[in-house]
């Protein structure tokens, strides 16, 4: 083997090591010019020098080292030539390892002495561990991971941390959303074949069966060809049947029937409708075609009708946003699908209002929007609702409109009988006298898709009551508030009804987002209890978290007798409900709906709506109760505010939320005692009565994440008194339930990113601390009698009087890195050989990343002080915060690599004869003990750092 001169380190004769029996068996000079320090006893002085022979091949992976007292180890001298206040982004090229093939051509026949040295190296490897098996891992410590790996030790990120940066931005192929359309995988496009029509899907399936080796470009062409025949403005969910029964046939009261539609899962999604044209042809109405598969009635007002329909759809779609739940997984974004502008409605004959006034004739032949259906005076119009809509639900004061004003705005009345964009069945209303026939037909109807029976029962229950005159504005059901009712019986029953409705709606959602709960203060139908009972039996988990105060038989029985039956012969149906004698504790009847954003919907008796006992709406009665509405609404908001304040932690970071509790409640029967909160006691002492404890405890609606909260601008225009409560100050988020207290302080984009990076790096630091302790325990177990400790006297900067989380993290990282360096020095002494060069390089880069974070933190403080000195309000610059977050991210990566290097060093140091079971058991006990201590510390103070509690 060729011997090179002039590129070696001095070779001292370690007399001190000979005395202690720790003389190295062989010297490992390497190709690096800088030496890595090895600790020895304080009293030993090294005078000899290792040989200047450089070994090629496997020996070229090792650096030369100089022994030094371990008590005087200085990080600044050990890892970087710069001072502690300076750093360099460049890395010495000598730190990198030479590959195996570098000197492959220069190898010559080695001498006998060199052969003996090589044999001793191999013997030492066999005696002292699995070093040969770790070469692949150790040499790749400094390389980036091929796949995006989370920096959290447990592998999962907290649910309230959402980063705007991908885990590994160097590999965009792993992030399909960052690629262009042409570079994305083909599989993500093939799954969209469910959007084709019958003919397209079948043809494509046959083609792929014949030839499964299509190229990606051919697949793209096939998909593009299929999409060219689509009209993107059309409805994406058409009925699967083309007969008359799948159309919305609005008929007279005597022949009203409930019809339900079946919607396909994959196919038949673009089959054109034929029921509308058939019905219109049979009715004798002149029609004409426009667009693609669209029809309209001929007449003078045909263009006007089309315009009205489009305006109505725009109004209707305003309340169909923020939807992230769909029954069919094929439709990733169901809220993008527009409603069917050609909904199948038959022409309604001229009707008369309850007071004898003819209905406005301008919308008689409107085939796009069916405005309302008139009932006799003793019945109520049942408005069709969509239970899966998720709207912002805060009551808006209903203006008092006369019949003339209503006739002008009638075209904008929301008809919720339109085809739902979720693939659910429409909700069809029917009068009480035909309900028995409808129920009988439903039981013998054609089987529907899964859970269809449940949706039938929901259809019959989730219909809100309005006046028989048809007075209804274009507002969702959460805007319908009630008027004062002079009869106490319906309000005693309303608690049961609202509770049941909230359960049904929450169960139908299947997620944390609850839907709109229509107020059923007065109905004229009886639900099909068999269907509801059957669903409860088949899906017991949906109702497992709810608690009723009476048995299941009485539950179904009470549901069957909903209040508001106006026929004299049906008054006896109230007995089973009124016998329950469910009354409010303080005279109020405030039903709380578990809304998506946790906002309270007050429907107490002081609110106003069409009177449920009389079929006539008196527009002059509303102002009589307006004062009571405002006063009692704000009182309930005050009381609910105290409940939400109890879910804020009392120490550390004020933005951390306790997610094990809830802040919303479905209604007043599921509310807990709010007086346990100190803030609520302060609010209650201002003259507002406190509610007593309710028997059902807290609600099951979980607390939403902070990024799901509604903005101030979205709320201010929905409620007229909101600006009076909160003033003109804007803010970026709302608490789940709000009152007069100002909302919480939220983070901006850079601050949020900094918070996420801090959490990641702190997690890596804790993991490094655990692994270092496990390493010490393993070494002490396998080398009894040896001094294996990471204790050192390396100077570490002290914290300031008011340190931030970044300052604490910097000090903790420096302290832990010094301990790891000391422990690695002990490992080299135990194994009598140097460790791999990548291990020392990983430690060098870790220290360098810490110095960079120190510099970024210093720049942030200096820039903030300069802005304050110039008279600018003290605020953080986004650039400084982003730079600090980027530096912390790099330090997190370096910490993870140090963990890998420590583990590799331990595996190379442990003797081969060590029993794995003897090592694993004490390590596991140590980890479990440390986890318990860490959990107890976090439970007392979430933001308390482990570095402050440990005794160093």
UniProtKB/Swiss-Prot annotation:
It comes from the Eukaryota. Residues 617-627 have a biased composition (Basic and acidic residues). GO terms for cellular component: cytoplasm; nucleus. Residues 936-952 have a biased composition (Polar residues). GO terms for biological process: chromosome organization involved in meiotic cell cycle; double-strand break repair; female meiosis I; germline cell cycle switching, mitotic to meiotic cell cycle; male meiosis I; metaphase chromosome alignment; mRNA stabilization; oocyte development. Its main location: cytoplasm. Residues 1-23, 609-629, 933-952 are annotated as: Disordered. Keywords: Cytoplasm, Meiosis, Nucleus. Expressed in fetal ovaries. Expressed in testis. It is found in: Cytoplasm; Nucleus. PROSITE patterns: PHOSPHOPANTETHEINE (PS00012). It holds the Pfam family MEIOC. Is required for meiosis completion in both male and female germ cells. Confers stability to numerous meiotic mRNAs in gonads allowing proper initiation and progression into meiosis prophase I. The function may involve YTHDC2 and is independent of induction by retinoic acid (RA). Maintains an extended meiotic prophase I by properly promoting the transition from a mitotic to a meiotic cell cycle program by binding transcripts through its interaction with YTHDC2 that regulate the mitotic cell cycle. Interacts with YTHDC2; binds transcript that regulate the mitotic cell cycle inhibiting progression into metaphase, thereby allowing meiotic prophase to proceed normally. Interacts with RBM46. This is Meiosis-specific coiled-coil domain-containing protein MEIOC. It comes from Homo sapiens (Human). The lineage of its organism: Eukaryota, Metazoa, Chordata, Craniata, Vertebrata. The gene is MEIOC.
